[in-house]
């Protein structure tokens, strides 16, 4: 089971990354943080290629940071969510470039990823979708 199960049917590629990310939060923090950023980028790029309100600002060469700053995205996402997405992107970049990481940062990232994926699923799912609350019990403890 996964906090991201709601993605499985329509966004299986993002689900697989998110599930793997979730499994690593307390075991391999750096990998979890980087994977959170990868899943965010896949989701953002999916939105830009599937939501006509975003088409004008999309260029596949743009970084996820540039896409997060685009005017069109600001019109369809709330400022608090965008702020969280920037934090996830920054923490992911820092982890990828060797900055110090820990399971607390990984926990922050997985929760932001959950917020983003929830927003994406509610906004774009072809069916009405129920998003359960984030369940900490589904995160591996690192003690096996």
Predicted regions and their residues:
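Amphipathic alpha-helical interface elements
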Residues: 1-144
